[in-house]
């Protein structure tokens, strides 16, 4: 590990010199690429330097203990040795995590697709609850939320809705939300007070660049039609809504949120690219994946990942067996406690995989 850390530190110094070179700065595209690479290495290098400083301090205290006869100074050195030993253990764990293979999509913006599942109108209302939860979470993170497409019901639910969330680290945090979400509650329309179970499916897709995926224009069928609002009523007198069908895969994306047909087409193309990229990544991952007990981070949508139980005020994440009794604040966007636990579990699995490889 130390050999790799020394290599990274040297690379960081090399990049520091390059990004301050006027001849490199003249090429803005190359300069921005180098700046990003430099920023990605910064936390590793700073942690490694802190680790080396702690090691030096530890050796210094050990030398003092050998040579010093003063009782108070010896006690002080012994106390510092204990503290530094613990600090070094913590820093070593931190460095191990920082050196784990990084998901190349972690820095990307995301699309979140929420679809009502089993449960009819109640499932559509739950989809609306999930949309609000992610919107509130994005607000806490100062991320931007943009509606891409929606299919609303008459009483405020969503059969399906897609939003774009833009902000630093959006995919790295939200990727764990892919899967089947289950709600247990008494619907407002239920006179007997019986608890119903409904589901909604969430898909989190990284926004992809044009260089990430290439789409042949001949593979697309683009239809335009008049946008409709709640209950199907027409809200536009021009054919501004767009439906794009990717013929080889059968994937269909619609967008009618904008008044402009061109803007709707641009939005729909972004979502289509993200879906095609996800499908390609899933196929690639499936071909090389090892058997893993946990599905944390894989985005397996066939798996029920979380239950929201209203009568008990409970949220249970089934992937890691974590239960919290804070349903109201959780649905108000306070979801970081669960996400942190999922990140930790994902890191632990990666460390196990690394151990098997080594």
UniProtKB/Swiss-Prot annotation:
Instruction: Kindly give the HAMAP family that the UniProt entry links to this protein.
Output: Rel_fac_1 (MF_00093)
Please give one Gene Ontology molecular function term for this protein.
translation release factor activity, codon specific
Q: Which gene encodes it?
A: prfA
Subcellular location per UniProt equals: Cytoplasm
Among the entry's GO cellular component annotations, what is one?
cytoplasm
Give the domain of life: Bacteria
Main localization is: cytoplasm
N5-methylglutamine PTM positions: 233
Keyword Translocase, does the record have it?
Answer: no
InterPro entries the record matches: PCRF, Pep_chain_release_fac_I, Pep_chain_release_fac_I_sf, Prokaryotic/Mito_RF, RF-1
Q: What is this protein called?
A: Peptide chain release factor 1
* Function noted in UniProt: Peptide chain release factor 1 directs the termination of translation in response to the peptide chain termination codons UAG and UAA.
Q: SUPFAM superfamilies, per this entry?
A: Release factor
Print the keywords alphabetically: Cytoplasm, Methylation, Protein biosynthesis
The organism named in the record is: Clostridium botulinum (strain 657 / Type Ba4)
């Amino acid at each position: 590990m130390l050999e790799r850390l020394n290599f990274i530190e040297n690379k960081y110094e090399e990049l520091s010199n390059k990004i301050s070179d006027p001849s490199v700065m003249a090429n803005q595209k190359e300069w921005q690429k180098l700046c990003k690479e430099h920023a990605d290495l910064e936390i590793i290098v700073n942690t490694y330097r802190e680790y080396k400083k702690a090691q030096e301090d530890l050796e210094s205290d050990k030398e003092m203990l050998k040579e010093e006869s003063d009782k108070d100074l010896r006690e002080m050195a012994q106390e510092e040795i204990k503290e530094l030993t613990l600090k070094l253990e913590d820093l070593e764990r931190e460095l191990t995590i920082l050196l784990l293979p990084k998901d190349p999509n972690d820095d990307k913006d995301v699309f979140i697709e929420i679809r009502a599942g089993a449960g009819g109108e109640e499932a559509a209302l739950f989809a609306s609850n999930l949309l609000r939860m992610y919107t509130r979470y994005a607000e806490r993170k100062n991320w931007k939320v943009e509606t891409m497409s929606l299919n609303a019901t008459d009483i405020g639910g969503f059969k399906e809705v897609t939003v774009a969330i833009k902000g630093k680290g959006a995919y790295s945090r939200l990727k764990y939300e892919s899967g089947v979400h289950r709600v247990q509650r008494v619907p407002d329309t239920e006179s007997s007070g019986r608890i119903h179970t409904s589901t909604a499916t969430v898909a989190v897709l990284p926004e992809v660049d044009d260089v990430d995926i290439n789409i042949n224009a001949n593979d697309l069928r683009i239809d335009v039609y008049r946008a409709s609002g709640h209950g199907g009523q027409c809200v536009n007198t021009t054919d501004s809504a767009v439906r794009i069908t990717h013929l080889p895969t059968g994937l269909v994306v619609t967008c009618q949120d904008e008044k402009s047909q061109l803007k709707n087409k641009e939005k729909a193309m972004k979502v289509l690219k993200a879906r095609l990229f996800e499908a390609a990544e899933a196929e690639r991952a499936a071909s090389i994946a090892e058997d893993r007990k946990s599905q944390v981070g894989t985005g397996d949508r066939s798996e029920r990942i979380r239950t929201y139980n209203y009568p008990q005020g409970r949220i249970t994440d089934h992937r890691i067996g974590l239960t919290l009794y804070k349903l109201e604040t959780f649905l108000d966007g306070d979801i970081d406690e669960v996400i942190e636990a999922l990140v930790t579990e994902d890191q632990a699995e990666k460390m196990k995989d690394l151990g098997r490889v080594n």
